[in-house]
Amino acid sequence: VCTVGGEGSHHALATALHARAVGLEAHLLLTPQPHTAHSRATHAAALAAATSVTALAASDPRSFAVGLAAWRERRRGYLIPTGGSCALGAVGMAEGALELRAQVDAGLLPPPRALYIAAGSGSSLAGLLLGLAAAWPDPRARPEVIAARVTPRHLVSRGRVLRIHEELKALLWGEEAPPPHVAAPPPFELLSATGPGYGAPSAAGEEARGWAEGVGFKLDPSYMGKMMGLLWARERERAREEGRAVVAWGTGAE
């Protein structure tokens, strides 16, 4: 198998470890990133576990194409998309949205008016959108979705998210028409929160991480910290004034 990610990618490390456990070779194409102690340790573990590691010049689609072509010339195998991003992987996020609705119905939390999520490669967001549409058939009752893009634009875009959403519908319903309320994805915002770049802590994210740690939550700087920074900037005063419930959807941790 071959997959792609940043040097500190949990997905790349997990691919290498699990491939080795079942007797498969694991070939990683890794892009450079600024490092924290955690990402540096993750990178070292991936180097030790993988069959081969190709260092890409930068997080650039041209560099990726060259690295992938070189791998295909040498070997035959299965390519796992960047971050494992695919329709099958999005199923769990759709189910997560149904769990959220069940918790609301059980009175465990108030109906959320907004939901924030970090977007790295798009499949988590696509699955969440489909799940929210299924869980809240009335679009007026659905939480608005704000995605914080934490990777370069070519890795996650509205078009990519919508494409995975279509693939997920095809996976779940096949040739049958899905229910009308899930036929089209709910509206969503995809806003940049990359800051200095992928893996590099942002000022807003670090401020939000400090606040979160004070109330008992440890957020990673690459995904959750930047997402929380966006939430903090947009919702801090609004939530106080309107008393509205907001969900921060967790997708990464150290």
Predicted regions, residues:
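PLP-dependent amino-acid enzyme catalytic core
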Residues: 1-254
